[in-house]
Amino acid sequence: METWQEVTVHVHRDAQEAVSYVLIETGSQGVAIADSADYIGQKDRFGELYPDVEQSDMIAITAYYPSSTNLADVIATINEQLAELASFGLQVGQVTVDSQELAEEDWADNWKKYYEPARITHDLTIVPSWTDYDASAGEKVIKLDPGMAFGTGTHPTTKMSLFALEQILRGGETVIDVGTGSGVLSIASSLLGAKTIYAYDLDDVAVRVAQENIDLNQGTDNIHVAAGDLLKGVSQEADVIVANILADILVLLTDDAYRLVKDQGYLILSGIISEKLDMVLEAAFSAGFFLETHMIQGEWNALVFKKTDDISGVIGG
């Protein structure tokens, strides 16, 4: 029986995406995230609060490596990368790293124990694909099986993106989802009434996972997934473009986004740590967008821009 090695990193919640990326880059076959915030305000089937969940700003990110991996080298690299992230101003917190071995069948399912149904916005709830869930009236359920390499939709950057989509979409829109990952934003757009959604990701694994998640949700055959490098080569105009990726990448797509967003349309940018906020704002303003909404959760920012000649009620330019 093949064994796997498990490394758990305890970091501040704001560092979730950056640290997950570090773990994948060091050879992890997947990550699982345990975050006490996912339980805040959640209730079980009988209306009772989840019991005795201690709330903390720290989260546990568990990565899984083949038994052949030199774990000492991996942990040394992880510590170096985490120190570098902290030097860039990202709030990492007091980092601790633990490791252990586990059997393959445990590795395959271990991450699922951290993943519970979560009400993300007023209307949207994300539910693991293996969980039975009875939706309430008006509740829109996103079935998701992100695999171990993608987030579960509960990170602040994803939450703010979903909130923005819920506020903007009224039905009949064309949406472009850049860096789709698990496909959660595309699925949400479909459930919120968008007519057609185009989802792009540079990673072939993400394209496959997104399509698998789309197939889990009924009525989402209006989502078209393809490999793509941001908006390069895209000619389809859209009412809304949404991108939840790193700030350094967001600034590379603002000009193409302005070309593709229809007049009175929206650009939603998320995944922005506070230190990178001005850089993203400058790129979007230079492209011609006006800022309509700025959302903040912890160290993370999400921005909603509008393409318009009527600047009443908007900021920037």
From Swiss-Prot:
User: Which SUPFAM superfamilies has this protein been placed in?
Assistant: S-adenosyl-L-methionine-dependent methyltransferases
Q: What is its main location?
A: cytoplasm
Query: Coiled-coil ranges per the record?
Result: none
Q: GO: which molecular function terms?
A: protein-lysine N-methyltransferase activity
List residues binding S-adenosyl-L-methionine.
Answer: T158, G179, D201, N244
The answer to whether keyword Metal-binding applies is no
A Pfam family annotated for this UniProt entry: PrmA
Tell me the InterPro entries matching this sequence.
Ribosomal_L11_MeTrfase_PrmA (IPR050078), Ribosomal_PrmA_MeTrfase (IPR004498), SAM-dependent_MTases_sf (IPR029063)
GO terms for biological process? methylation
Presence of keyword Metal-binding:
no
Cellular compartments annotated: Cytoplasm
Keywords in alphabetical order: Cytoplasm, Methyltransferase, S-adenosyl-L-methionine, Transferase
| Reaction catalysis annotation | L-lysyl-[protein] + 3 S-adenosyl-L-methionine = N(6),N(6),N(6)-trimethyl-L-lysyl-[protein] + 3 S-adenosyl-L-homocysteine + 3 H(+)
Specify the domain of life of the species encoding this protein.
Bacteria
- What EC number is given for this enzyme? 2.1.1.-
Q: Which GO terms describe its cellular component?
A: cytoplasm
Q: Which PANTHER family match?
A: ELECTRON TRANSFER FLAVOPROTEIN BETA SUBUNIT LYSINE METHYLTRANSFERASE
General function of this protein: Methylates ribosomal protein L11.
Q: Which HAMAP family match?
A: Methyltr_PrmA (MF_00735)
The record's comment on protein family reads:
Belongs to the methyltransferase superfamily. PrmA family.
Q: What is this protein called?
A: Ribosomal protein L11 methyltransferase
Q: Which organism is it from?
A: Streptococcus pyogenes serotype M5 (strain Manfredo)
What gene does this protein come from?
A: prmA
